[in-house]
C-alpha cells in the first residue's frame, strides 16, 4: 500500500507527503535526508496517514491537503485521533 501522511515538526508546523513505508520515511526525515522543509525542523513525527492502492492516488490526496489551511489539517488529525 501507498500512504499519504501528515508529520508534525519540532516547531509545530505540519508537513504533508506520500510514501511506501511510513516508518522508513519518518526515519529518513529525522536523519536529515528527507525533504528540505523538515531538515531544519527535526524531529518530526507522523501524526496522520491514509492508505491508497497507487502512488498517484496518494500524491493526489497530498496535493489536495497541501492546499488546506493549518486549521483544516489540524481538524483532520483531531478527527483521526478520536476514532
Where are these regions (language model features)?
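GIY-YIG nuclease catalytic motif and its immediate N-terminal context
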Residues: 1-66, 70-83
Amino acid at each position: 500500500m501507498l500512504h499519504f501522511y501528515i508529520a508534525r515538526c519540532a516547531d509545530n508546523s505540519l508537513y504533508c507527503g506520500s510514501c511506501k513505508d511510513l516508518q522508513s520515511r519518518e526515519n529518513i526525515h529525522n536523519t536529515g535526508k528527507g525533504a528540505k522543509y523538515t531538515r531544519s525542523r527535526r524531529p518530526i513525527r507522523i501524526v496522520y496517514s491514509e492508505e491508497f492502492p497507487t502512488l498517484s492516488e496518494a500524491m493526489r490526496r497530498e496535493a489536495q491537503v497541501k492546499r488546506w489551511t493549518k486549521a483544516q489539517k489540524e481538524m483532520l488529525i483531531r478527527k483521526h485521533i478520536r476514532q
